[in-house]
């Protein structure tokens, strides 16, 4: 896997988007592009030894798109056998705590409305989602970090960069 920097530690620096096969399918990328843009996806496949993290910008609401797609991974509750942290950040440098929109996240069936920049810790096996972007006034930066080398649901389905 080619990385972007040279030198002894250049292989530890990712500057391009390298998605797992399941996320790089044209229909998946087109669907995501309707409301946001992925920036990076790091995992044990494209950076051996790394835990999984992905980043993106959200530009438009996604609620209707999620509700109309029964295959959406964030449209239904799921859990992981490892902890996860979700981050949601507004893009106004003068007011960094203003999310610049509204995100709704369900944790074990309980709805949480986020309008401030937030980090959410999800312990192992805690059901979470749906995750809806209800309103976007300014771009919202989102990330997900899981303490596992691959992103899996319910301990079953693995997303790998084949």
Regions found by a protein language model. Name each.
Residues 59-61, 91, 147-149:
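Non-catalytic surface loops within mature trypsin-like serine protease
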Residues 67-73, 107-108, 124-128:
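Short acidic (Asp/Glu) patches
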């Amino acid at each position: 896997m080619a990385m972007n920097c040279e030198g002894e530690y250049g292989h530890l620096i990712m500057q391009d988007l390298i998605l797992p096969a399941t996320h790089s399918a044209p229909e998946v990328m087109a669907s995501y592009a309707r409301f946001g843009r992925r920036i990076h996806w790091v995992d044990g496949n494209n950076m051996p030894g790394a835990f999984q993290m992905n980043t993106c910008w959200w530009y438009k609401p996604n609620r209707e798109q999620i509700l109309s797609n029964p295959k959406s991974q964030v449209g239904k509750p799921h859990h992981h056998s490892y902890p996860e942290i979700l981050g949601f950040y507004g893009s106004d440098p003068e007011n960094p705590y203003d999310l610049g929109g509204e995100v709704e996240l369900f944790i074990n069936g309980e709805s949480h409305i986020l309008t401030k920049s937030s980090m959410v810790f999800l312990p192992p096996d805690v059901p979470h989602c749906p995750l809806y972007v209800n309103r976007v006034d300014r771009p919202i930066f989102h990330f997900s970090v899981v303490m596992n080398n691959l992103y899996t649901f319910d301990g079953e389905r693995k997303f790998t960069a084949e």
